[in-house]
């Protein structure tokens, strides 16, 4: 037996070198075994990995190591999502080129990731800023262009005049750019878009096939796609009230049943009718400008005060020519949703009710809850949006709301204005085409040329990649590509005239929408994928990443896979068979007396009574212990993975990340928890060494029979093996760790009873101890791979445990010899009885009736009936 402590600093780099030297994690594409593809969302090379990365990649690594041990051909690659704005910011702030900054960060982070002991195939590594990667992205852009999946169109955009770039709606805060603080302008610009809307219905329906995705993620995507069935209505306008004699206003509604409750029409500030009305109405023009200044993000609009401006235009009710409705420009209507216009029925829509209450337009209920007297239905501050019967609706009265919808559709579809029906059933989607144009340097160049004679001309494929110039400066606002003296000036490949390159680059979401396919054969120099290989290795069997990517990244990847199928690069529709969203790593916050934040390594904490007291280690100054929050640099509640690995080792960090909390929930970082993981690692090391000593007495061959104690240990070992195997497959890693701890306790108790002196050990006990220790090492090898290699050799095994096959479960050892049954008397639990699993009913009845609690409950009377549910429960009827 050894008394030495396990030395992680010595062992971990040694075993990492052994894995690398033998290239045991390299995946062969021609391997005939069944494949298993596990992938964590690849990181942005910011310069340092954070503790959340450790958790994310440890989760994937456990799966990869387990499936490899189960005999699968595992693909577990790593790369870098390397384009993006931070590199440009670094160029501005630190006077370092984006390329140099990015690749320096990759080098540093790769070293950190290697220190975690991840079983990655580094031979497949790439960065999305590698020309050898984005060359193929540019080729696919041209393929999409030919297939009608990429187009250039004019779009209204948010323009930051200081940063000179387009902003997403979410980047406009209180009418100002999130970064520059400049007042945002609404402009119309040519933008490149991917036609994701061509797949709206397919993307929606296919969510039902993704049964290994979290329900919340599928729901978020379902809501984002936003399918709604309704009616497209053409409201006639009173020409005497319109600026240019406009004849109609189109609206899309999902509630045509509420038409008789209409009180107003509302149009978006940038609706053509609003723009026309504002030309001769300065007050309206100012109102529209104010709406734009207040922000365009949906979340911001939803929470803003509802505001409107009466244009003076009147719309005519489709069922009554004498009934007109005022047309307002409203700040809560967006042009990109539906038609940019609505009719407002305030009694049955809260937003509309808030609006009419402000402007005194009143409301008329038209849907009455079942069983309620319509005369008593009064709407004041809360709209009724439930089902019911129609009231105050003329020919619809008495119908259900659903029947009323059909009746309105039937009548208006048959009524013609000109050569078009007044109403038309339509399916509407919230999803909009994906605008990919970004006015930034550090991104994938869009491979088109603008010619004054030929218009938009694709770059010939033999001229790909269109690479970024490196001699750029960032001394002017806007896109450095626009300012470059030569890069954008080219000759048109069609006519030879002077032309210019497209200076917009692609949204970085494009880079991450197909990288998983490239990993299947990153050595292909002529095409994005090798279809034969990609179709065999894909889809990704288990994808892991944060829930913050539940909508855009995952939805764009699903679109891209379909677009790649349409252009011959893949043959499947869905990229990810299984999706798992891990929780965050969170930490307490510590606030100093001056209001500043202290980092965990600056704070000392001691127990005081039933509470805790925190002070600054340097000064003894009291520190307020704040809420447990997501780790952030601003609140300084971060933990450096290098410090943890340097102090305790990677296996300790990995084990802590997997323990206690289910992996889909947040894990609270605590120094005590890390120390506990470190102590358990040392305990495992001692246990294995003691077992190795005892195992020296074990016969080479498995004994023919086992005594009671040896059999009990074997049952515990194979029971743990079964539970941990099931737990990993179900991603219940914290449960697996609890099972391993429990089994380690059983092994320790057995060693304590029998000792390790080989002369004192019976062959069956010695053999069982060696088997149990071997199984234990293999159970924790996916979680603590370095320790497991050290333990594997301590037990006398040759080779690497990382290459060993997962132990076979002996199912007959999982059958329990006894079973404990709860006993009820007249429906109330009175006790339990333990009997042999194979005990016949008469034997069980005798044991039950012998229980004192049962005799007392029966009051000395015989039982009238005993009902035995096999292996479950016994019911005694007195």
Swiss-Prot record:
One Pfam family in the UniProt entry: tRNA-synt_1g
Motif, 'HIGH' region: chain positions: 43-53
Annotated binding of ATP, by residue: 633
Gene3D superfamilies assigned to the protein according to its UniProt record, in alphabetical order: 2.20.28.290, 3.10.20.590, HUPs, Isoleucyl-tRNA Synthetase, Domain 1
Principal subcellular localisation of the protein: cytoplasm
Entries under InterPro entries matching the protein: aa-tRNA-synth_I_CS (IPR001412), aa-tRNA-synth_Ia (IPR002300), Leu-tRNA-ligase (IPR002302), Leu_tRNA-synth_edit (IPR025709), M/V/L/I-tRNA-synth_anticd-bd (IPR013155), Methionyl/Leucyl_tRNA_Synth (IPR015413), Rossmann-like_a/b/a_fold (IPR014729), tRNAsynth_Ia_anticodon-bd (IPR009080)
Keywords: Aminoacyl-tRNA synthetase, ATP-binding, Cytoplasm, Ligase, Nucleotide-binding, Protein biosynthesis
Motif ('KMSKS' region): 630-634
Catalytic activity: tRNA(Leu) + L-leucine + ATP = L-leucyl-tRNA(Leu) + AMP + diphosphate
Compartment annotation: Cytoplasm
Enzyme Commission designation: 6.1.1.4
GO cellular component terms given for this protein: cytosol
Family the entry assigns: Belongs to the class-I aminoacyl-tRNA synthetase family.
Protein name as annotated: Leucine--tRNA ligase
Organism: Nitrobacter hamburgensis (strain DSM 10229 / NCIMB 13809 / X14)
Lineage: Bacteria, Pseudomonadati, Pseudomonadota, Alphaproteobacteria, Hyphomicrobiales
């Amino acid at each position: 037996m050894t008394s030495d402590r396990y030395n992680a600093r010595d062992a971990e780099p040694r075993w990492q070198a052994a894995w690398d030297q033998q290239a045991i994690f390299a995946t062969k594409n021609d391997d005939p075994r069944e494949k298993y593809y596990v992938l964590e969302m690849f990181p942005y090379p910011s310069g340092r990995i954070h503790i959340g990365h450790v958790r994310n990649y440890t989760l994937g690594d456990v799966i990869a190591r387990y499936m490899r041990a189960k005999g699968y051909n595992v693909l577990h690659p790593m790369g870098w999502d390397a384009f993006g704005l931070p590199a440009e910011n670094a160029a501005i702030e630190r006077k370092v080129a984006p390329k140099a900054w990015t690749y320096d960060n990759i080098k540093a982070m790769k070293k950190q990731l290697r220190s975690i002991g991840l079983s990655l195939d580094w031979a497949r590594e790439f960065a999305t800023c590698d020309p050898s990667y984005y060359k193929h992205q540019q080729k696919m852009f041209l393929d999409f262009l030919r297939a009608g999946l990429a187009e250039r169109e004019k779009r209204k955009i948010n323009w930051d005049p200081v940063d000179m770039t387009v902003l997403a709606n979410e980047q406009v805060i209180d009418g100002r750019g999130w970064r520059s603080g400049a007042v945002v302008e609404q402009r119309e610009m040519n933008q490149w878009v991917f036609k994701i809307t061509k797949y709206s219905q397919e993307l929606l329906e296919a969510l039902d096939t993704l049964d290994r995705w979290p329900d919340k993620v599928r729901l978020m995507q379902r809501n984002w796609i936003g399918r709604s069935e309704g009616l497209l209505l053409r409201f006639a306008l009173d020409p005497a009230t319109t600026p240019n004699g406009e004849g109609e206003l189109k609206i899309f509604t999902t509630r045509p049943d509420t038409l008789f409750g209409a009180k107003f029409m509302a149009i978006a500030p940038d609706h053509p009718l609003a723009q026309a009305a504002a030309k001769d109405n300065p007050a309206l023009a100012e109102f529209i400008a104010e709406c734009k200044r207040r922000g365009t993000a949906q979340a911001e609009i939803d929470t803003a005060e509802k505001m409107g401006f009466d244009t003076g235009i009147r719309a005519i009710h489709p069922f009554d020519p004498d009934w007109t409705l005022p047309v307002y420009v409203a700040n809560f209507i967006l042009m990109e949703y539906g038609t940019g216009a609505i009719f407002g029925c305030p009694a049955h829509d809260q937003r509309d009710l808030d609006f009419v209450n402000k402007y005194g337009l009143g409301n008329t209920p038209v849907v009455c809850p079942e069983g309620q007297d319509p005369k008593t239905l009064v709407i004041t501050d809360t709209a009724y949006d439930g089902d019911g019967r129609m009231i105050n609706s003329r020919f619809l009265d008495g119908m259900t709301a659903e029947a009323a919808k059909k009746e309105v559709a039937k009548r208006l579809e048959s009524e013609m204005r000109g050569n078009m029906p007044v109403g038309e059933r339509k399916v509407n989607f919230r999803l909009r085409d994906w605008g990919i144009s970004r006015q930034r340097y550090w991104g994938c160049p869009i491979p088109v040329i603008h010619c004054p004679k030929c218009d938009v001309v694709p770059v010939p494929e033999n001229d790909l990649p269109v690479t970024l110039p490196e001699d750029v400066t960032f001394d002017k606002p806007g896109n450095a590509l626009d300012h470059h003296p030569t890069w954008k000036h080219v000759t048109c490949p069609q006519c030879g005239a002077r032309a210019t390159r497209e200076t917009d680059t692609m949204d970085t979401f494009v880079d991450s929408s197909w990288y998983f396919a490239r990993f299947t054969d990153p050595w292909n120099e002529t095409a994005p994928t090798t279809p034969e290989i990609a179709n065999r290795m894909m889809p990704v069997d288990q994808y892991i990443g944060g829930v913050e990517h539940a909508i855009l990244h995952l939805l764009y990847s699903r679109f891209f896979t379909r677009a790649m199928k349409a252009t011959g690069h893949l043959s499947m529709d869905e990229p990810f068979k299984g999706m798992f969203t891990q929780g965050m790593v969170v930490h307490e916050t510590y606030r100093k007396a001056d209001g500043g934040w202290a980092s965990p390594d600056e704070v000392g904490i001691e127990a005081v009574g039933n509470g805790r007291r925190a002070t600054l280690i340097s000064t003894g100054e009291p520190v307020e212990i704040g809420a447990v929050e997501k780790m952030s640099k601003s609140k300084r509640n971060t933990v450096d993975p290098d410090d943890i690995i340097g102090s305790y080792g990677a296996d300790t960090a990995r084990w802590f990340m997997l323990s206690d909390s289910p992996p889909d929930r947040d894990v609270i970082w605590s120094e005590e928890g890390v120390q506990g993981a470190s102590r358990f690692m040392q305990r495992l090391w001692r246990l294995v060494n003691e077992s190795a000593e005892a195992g020296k007495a074990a016969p080479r061959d498995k004994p023919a029979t086992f005594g009671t104690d040896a059999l009990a240990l074997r049952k515990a070992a194979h029971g743990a093996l079964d539970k941990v195997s099931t737990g990993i497959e179900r991603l219940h890693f914290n449960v697996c760790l609890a099972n391993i701890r429990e089994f380690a306790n059983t092994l320790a108790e057995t060693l304590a009873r029998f000792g390790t002196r080989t002369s004192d050990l019976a062959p069956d006990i010695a053999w069982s101890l060696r088997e149990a220790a071997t199984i234990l090492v293999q159970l924790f090898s996916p979680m603590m791979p370095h320790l497991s290699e050290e333990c594997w050799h301590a037990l006398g095994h040759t080779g690497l445990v990382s290459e060993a096959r997962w132990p076979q479960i002996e199912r007959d050892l999982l059958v329990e010899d006894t079973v404990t049954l709860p006993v009820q008397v007249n429906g109330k639990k009175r006790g339990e009885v333990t009997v042999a699993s194979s005990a016949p009913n008469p034997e069980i009845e005798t044991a039950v009736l012998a229980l004192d609690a049962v005799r007392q409950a029966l009051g000395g009377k015989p039982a009238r009936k005993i009902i035995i549910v096999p292996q479950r429960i016994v019911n005694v009827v007195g």
